[in-house]
Design a protein with these regions (language model features):
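Residues at structural and domain junctions
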Residues: 42, 49, 151, 192-193
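Metzincin-family zinc-dependent endopeptidase catalytic domain
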Residues: 50-168, 172-175
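Metalloprotease/metallohydrolase-associated module, dominated by Zn2+-dependent proteases
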Residues: 139-149, 155-156, 172-233
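Soluble periplasmic/extracytoplasmic beta-strand elements of cell-envelope proteins
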Residues: 43, 117-119, 180-182
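N-terminal export leaders
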Residues: 3-7
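Disordered inhibitory propeptide/activation segment of secreted metzincin zinc metalloprotease zymogens
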Residues: 8-11, 17-53, 58-68, 112, ...
Length: 233
């Protein structure tokens, strides 16, 4: 398949701290330095035949290969596929106003059987985003339909999902236009027909800082963003 030049603003991490099943006001900023204490399980929410599902599995393999090559034991966990979906309206509204969470969106994330919830939306009115939700110990990754691109290539979906999973692992933006974690409107990507954009040397060092060679998963699901035991989430 030929490479396609696509201009896409990938830089869109938003935060939410939902703690009840009613629409609510939320802090604006995501927790910094998100680090998993265990192996996070992946749950895909989409139709059964969604063309983006293989791209997710490839992106998970990418993020498991990177720590392995660096000598870290950290991995993303098993991937499950649920035919439940999150409405495009809920995702669009949350992306536009992340301080407000609709009950239906909160319940969908809370009930999903996984730690990293990847919602493959049939809507295209928002950019991809990743949102840590410490109160329910989950991370929401929302991916739009890509219908606005006449011939979306597998390289587009694969790299967009991998970019968002980079946030879920704990990385942030950089300004290197040809790297995977470049964020913002200045990133003009020619998506490769095979494989992924690379991580920078600094990002590889950051991964080893977060998940060093002696890193081992612990039984309880706790991450740095969690409140201390015995306090409200």
């Amino acid at each position: 398949m030929n490479r396609r030049t696509v201009v896409l603003s990938l830089g869109s991490i938003v935060a939410a701290w939902p703690s009840c099943s009613h629409a609510q006001s939320l802090p604006r900023h995501a927790p910094q330095g998100l680090t998993w204490k265990d192996i996070p399980k992946i749950c895909i929410l989409s139709a059964e035949d969604d063309f983006r599902v293989p791209a997710i599995r490839e992106a998970v393999e990418f993020w498991n290969a990177e720590p392995s090559q660096l000598g870290s034991a950290f991995r993303l966990g098993t991937t499950a596929h649920s035919l439940r979906t999150i409405s495009a309206d809920d995702l669009h509204a949350y992306r536009a106003t992340p301080r407000i969470v609709a009950p239906s969106l909160l319940n969908s994330v809370r009930e999903a059987n996984g730690d990293v919830i990847i919602a493959l939306s049939d809507g295209d009115g928002f950019n991809p985003f990743t949102s840590p939700w410490p109160a329910v110990r989950k991370v929401l990754v929302a991916i739009p339909s890509f219908r606005k691109y006449s011939l979306p290539s597998p390289g587009l979906a694969r790299n967009v999902v991998a970019h968002e999973l980079g946030y879920a692992v704990g990385l942030g933006h950089n300004d290197v236009a040809t790297s995977l974690m470049c964020g913002g409107a200045w990133c003009h990507f020619e998506f490769p027909s095979a494989g992924f954009f690379a991580l920078t040397t600094a990002e590889k060092a950051k991964l080893l800082e977060m998940y060093p060679p002696h890193w081992q998963p612990v039984p309880s699901r706790r991450w740095k963003a969690d409140p201390p035991a015995g306090t409200a989430g």
